[in-house]
């Protein structure tokens, strides 16, 4: 499985510059556009990057499988199909965490620039930004885990047609329900209360992480079963 994971990371490294460029553009635009909305608006850029990263990485890796017959060639390498599945899930999670951490760090470094707008650079603000970014990433990962078996069962293009509706529907429902440019942050704050305790936010984030981990295990098991019987 280690060799399969190294193979996946090598692919992601070739895609990293373009993914990072898109992420940086979205971060700058959303941060500047929503900075006047207070703490939740200030974290909009970091949350958006954290949420989009798992989806972009999943689609990028699935798309690479179809290039130059890589998926069929990989089947001839000394990797079991279970190793390939586990490596794909692990790679998606690891690079999603890296992107979320980078976005959060950029957001924290940018805080002093927005002091004139009434956004203080306090530990509470930093913790809320980090928690909202982590929650955004975890919720996005859960959507990825729901869609990932489709990619291993039907291939990239067919699965993309099937899953894009899922992502669009969930995104529209979330935005409509919360009426916010940063729904995850506002959702966390509404549960935690007007003056959220860091312990409460931490517990909420930990609960989401447990759900994501359970869904990851189920999704990985399903993907392994469907990929083993798939004719490459």
Predicted regions and their residues:
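Hydrophobic alpha-helical transmembrane segments of membrane proteins
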Residues: 1-69, 87-232
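Short helix-to-coil transition segments within interhelical loops
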Residues: 75-81
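Alpha-helix N-cap/helix-start motif at helix boundaries, enriched for small hydrophobics
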Residues: 83-85
């Amino acid at each position: 499985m280690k060799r399969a994971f190294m193979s996946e990371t090598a692919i992601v490294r070739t895609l990293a510059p373009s993914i990072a460029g898109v992420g940086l553009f979205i971060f700058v635009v959303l941060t500047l556009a929503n900075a006047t909305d207070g703490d939740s608006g200030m974290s909009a850029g970091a949350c958006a990057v954290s949420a989009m990263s798992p989806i972009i990485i999943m689609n990028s890796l699935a798309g690479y499988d179809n290039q130059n017959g890589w998926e069929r060639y990989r089947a001839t390498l000394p990797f079991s199909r279970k190793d390939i599945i586990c490596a794909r899930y692990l790679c998606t999670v690891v690079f999603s965490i890296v992107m979320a951490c980078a976005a959060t760090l950029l957001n924290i470094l940018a805080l002093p620039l927005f002091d004139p707008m009434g956004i203080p650079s306090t530990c509470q603000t930093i913790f809320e930004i980090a928690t909202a970014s982590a929650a955004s990433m975890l919720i996005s990962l859960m959507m990825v885990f729901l869609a990932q078996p489709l990619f291993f069962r039907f291939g990239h293009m067919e699965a993309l047609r099937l899953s894009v509706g899922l992502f669009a529907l969930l995104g529209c429902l979330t935005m409509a329900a919360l009426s916010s440019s940063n729904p995850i942050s506002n959702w966390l704050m509404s549960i935690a209360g007007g003056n959220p305790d860091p312990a409460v936010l931490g517990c909420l984030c930990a609960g989401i992480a447990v759900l994501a981990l359970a869904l990851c295990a189920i999704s990985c098991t399903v993907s392994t079963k469907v990929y083993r019987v798939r004719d490459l």
